């Protein structure tokens, strides 16, 4: 009998398979990969040596309102590692920056206090300004025009009125949007329900080109 531990949420599930029913075990080459440095060092290195863009600290100079869009509780982004370094980099360039962390929930439910603490740690949760996006809060949306799909584009006022807008998260292939992260931090991340439904809907998912986009 072979025993396997399968990752499941924050825990693991145990599975047992009889040897006679086990054809083999496929092990990814990443299984034994060892990064040349730790996670915090990798992020710091990226912040100090960005590709094709000025350093974040330089972009933050003279920017009063800075908004950092962060993924919500549904995305396993290691924000405990990333966010402190992003905030430090912004304040390196502008110690007086008024920074708001905007949680990009899209149409998801509100991120709870406990989930924020789990994501960022108590230091950031206690001492930084964190706003959870609400797609139905129309009073805090700004109209920015028409989408190619014909829908109205409403985006969270904090993001629109920021002097500097930063998106924290990961980028991976997406089966109909091309790639997640980046632009998706804004739409659907901090857009209104009406706007999201014009851009993120069943018709797009069912489109014949949706799978093709995921490999572009």
Language-model features: locations:
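Auxiliary alpha/beta "docking" domains used to position bulky ligands
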Residues: 92, 96-110
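N-terminal amphipathic/basic leader segments beginning at the initiator methionine
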Residues: 1-45
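A short, gly/pro- and small-residue-rich
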Residues: 89, 175-197
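Histidine-anchored nucleotide/phosphate-binding helix
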Residues: 75-96
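Glycine-rich phosphate/diphosphate-binding loops that line cofactor/substrate pockets in enzymes
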Residues: 51-67, 91-97
């Amino acid at each position: 009998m072979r025993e396997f531990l399968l990752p499941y949420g924050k825990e693991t599930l145990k599975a047992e398979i009889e040897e006679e029913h086990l054809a083999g075990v496929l092990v990814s080459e990443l299984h034994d990969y060892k990064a040349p440095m730790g996670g915090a060092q990798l992020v710091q290195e990226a912040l100090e040596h960005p590709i094709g863009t000025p350093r974040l600290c330089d972009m933050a100079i003279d920017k009063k309102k800075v908004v950092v869009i962060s993924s919500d509780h549904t995305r396993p982004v290691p924000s405990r590692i990333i966010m402190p370094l992003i905030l430090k980099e912004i304040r390196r360039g502008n110690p007086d920056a008024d920074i708001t962390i905007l949680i990009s929930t899209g149409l998801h439910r509100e991120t709870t206090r406990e989930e924020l603490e789990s994501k960022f740690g108590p230091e950031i949760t206690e001492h930084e300004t964190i706003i959870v996006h609400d797609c139905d809060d129309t009073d805090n949306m700004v109209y920015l025009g028409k989408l190619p799909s014909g829908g109205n584009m409403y985006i969270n006022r904090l993001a629109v009125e920021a002097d500097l807008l930063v998106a924290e998260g990961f980028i991976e292939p997406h089966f109909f949007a091309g790639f997640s992260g980046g632009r998706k931090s804004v739409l659907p991340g901090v857009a209104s329900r009406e706007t999201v439904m014009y851009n993120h809907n069943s018709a797009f998912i069912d489109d014949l080109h949706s799978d093709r986009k995921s490999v572009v």
